[in-house]
Amino acid sequence: MTQRVYSIVLFLCFGLMNPFATGIFMDKLASKKLCADDDCVYTISLVRAEEDYNAPDCRFINIKKGQLIYVYSKLVKEKESGEFWAGSVYGEEYEDHMGTVGYFPRSLVSEQHVYQEANKTIPTTDIDFFCE
């Protein structure tokens, strides 16, 4: 009995400390995305936010008017869904959020500089919409 309790306690401790055990898979926003490369790691463009945006859930990022955002992928719009791009904020004043990649509405930003064309169409996967 003691060994069973000890095993359960260890399992709970390691399970709670493991960051992979705390995530959740959210609904897909699209089935395809456009990227600059096959792995979607290269920056497509730099955009500036034209309006503030409060993220409705963990798939999205908060953006402030005037903020610069690096774009890594562009979801292919489907039927009545919105058009969303994935990126991360840029700038020293936003260093707490730098590196966090999330979606934001394309309609709220203007492209400042295009680094590479997004000409690779890639299927989205569940991990594209995973939240920690």
Swiss-Prot record:
SMART domains xref list: SH3
Domain SH3: 42-114
Species name: Gallus gallus (Chicken)
Keyword list, A-Z: Disulfide bond, Secreted, SH3 domain, Signal
Record-linked Gene3D superfamilies: SH3 Domains
Listed name of the protein: Otoraplin
GO biological process: cartilage condensation
Annotated InterPro entries: OTOR, Otoraplin_SH3, SH3-like_dom_sf, SH3_domain
Presence of the UniProt keyword Signal in the record: yes
Tissues expressing this chain: Highly expressed in cochlea.
A Pfam family recorded for this sequence: SH3_2
Disulfide-bonded cysteines: C35-C40, C58-C131
GO cellular component: extracellular region
Family, as annotated: Belongs to the MIA/OTOR family.
Record localization: Secreted
Signal peptide interval: 1-23
